């Protein structure tokens, strides 16, 4: 039976503060810090899904050279998610190279899909920013459609 996911709300601070994501991909390792103070709901959601193994084995289903790579859809088509949606959080940063943000289908439709910016881009503030790549931008640049996230874990942020 397929696992049922439900939105966790904001997790306790000790589960989301000073955390980073370590993602093993077909092309190598990507590490990104999480902005728990700016986007606690979104960080809680990403931590919850990651700890549950949601992202393990999923692919990057969308790559726009010079713009973004996108993943987090269990269907691999850009239409799937965890089975729930949650509200946007105010965007407090520009969409610069390495920024990690939620992909959505309109206001308050966040789920599991996320994207990583390949270059600084002036986007409207419609996509909740919740992290930034700290290691592996060379790997991000090599990601192509179909590349796999083989392992995604949450860990204490490197000092």
Indicate residue ranges for each PLM-predicted region:
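Cyclophilin-like peptidyl-prolyl cis-trans isomerases
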Residues: 1-159
């Amino acid at each position: 039976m397929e696992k049922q996911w439900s939105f966790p709300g904001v997790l306790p601070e000790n589960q989301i503060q000073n955390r980073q994501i370590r993602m093993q991909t077909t092309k190598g390792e990507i590490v990104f810090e999480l902005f728990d103070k700016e986007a606690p709901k979104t960080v809680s959601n990403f931590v919850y899904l990651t700890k549950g193994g949601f992202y393990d084995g999923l692919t990057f289903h969308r790559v726009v050279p010079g713009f973004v790579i996108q993943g987090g859809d269990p269907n691999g088509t850009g239409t799937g998610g965890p089975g729930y949606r949650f509200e946007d959080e105010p965007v407090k940063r520009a969409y610069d190279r390495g920024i990690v943000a939620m992909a959505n289908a309109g206001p308050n439709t966040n789920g599991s899909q996320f994207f990583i910016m390949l270059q600084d881009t002036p986007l409207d503030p419609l996509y909740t920013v919740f992290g930034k790549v700290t290691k592996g931008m060379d790997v991000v640049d090599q990601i192509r459609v179909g590349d796999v996230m083989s392992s995604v874990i949450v860990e204490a942020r490197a000092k």
